[in-house]
Amino acid sequence: MSLSKVFSLISFNRFMLIPFMIISLMMPACMPTPSIMKMKPEYYPQCYQPFEDLEQAKRDLISRTLIGAGLGAVSGAVVGGVATGNVKGAAIGAGIGALGGALVGYVHAKRSQYKNDKERMRSYQADMNADMRNASRVEQYAMTSLQCYTREFNTLLKKYKKGELSKEEVQARYKEIREGMTYIAEILKDSKDKLVQRDEEYREAFAFEARTKNRPAPEVASLEKKREAAAKRRPSANVKGDGSRELRKVSTEANTRKVQAERNAQKVEKQEAAMVAAAEKKKGTSSIKTVSKYYEKQYLNSVVSLEEAENVNDRTLAAMSVAAKHAGIDMV
């Protein structure tokens, strides 16, 4: 091997260290919040119990984002390094690649892995199904915990009014309830944000696949318009009276959402099984337009549903604050 080739190989390897450094810096942002994860339930372990399932559902939902960013960072480093011939150029390329990696990396990874159109369309649908199933599980477990905390909060107030617990004891328990509810809020927001990011991935895939066939990108309903329409239908966040009526209302809502989320997850699992059966028979669509319609009909609702669950959690916290203030134990 010539000396020039040795130096070229060293330079290339030096460039390739950069994307991995960037991904290592990105990883903490995808991890659960340490302060929340260190929470040790002293009074309500039964309400904390679903959190393990909640965390797993969230991890399943976000795992593909980091992989896509990694692919983008690697390709960006190569392009940047080749274009400029130095480490700085590779670093800039890796950074840009990481930001766009979830979009470009996803599409190109699919096309590299699946040359057959039907197999690739099935793969897109499989990803959508996995995202929808995990999102439904996140909502199901979140609403289970929310219901538990609401029930315990109501019991706490009753005991305090009867003089069975001191103000200090009640506040300690109330603090744990709010910590758990805050954790639920963070999980729901993180999961919803990932689905919104995936929306960009899928739309990019639809457009790219259409371009390869010299066809216009399929028209897909706007996610933002769907979210705006849902927001207009939400109940008022204002809490009237002592908050007890609102607590009953949101608890009922949470139960409805929990049941529906479980049904949605089961529905997706059946769809996944049907897709596997179709794949074994070498059936399925090769049309990106068909896949985009499937996406529009089902996936967008998953984003809105998580946003609705966020709203229920926020309204529950607001009602708790009002009820606690009326009882004389408010701390926030």
Regions found by a protein language model. Give the residues of each.
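Bacterial N-terminal signal peptides that target proteins for export
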Residues: L3-L17
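Helix-termini ("caps") and immediately adjacent flexible loops/tails
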Residues: L9, M31-T65, Y106-V332
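C-terminal motif of bacterial Sec signal peptides marking the signal peptidase cleavage site
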Residues: L25-A29
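Short, low-complexity, glycine-enriched hydrophobic/amphipathic alpha-helices that associate
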Residues: L54-K115
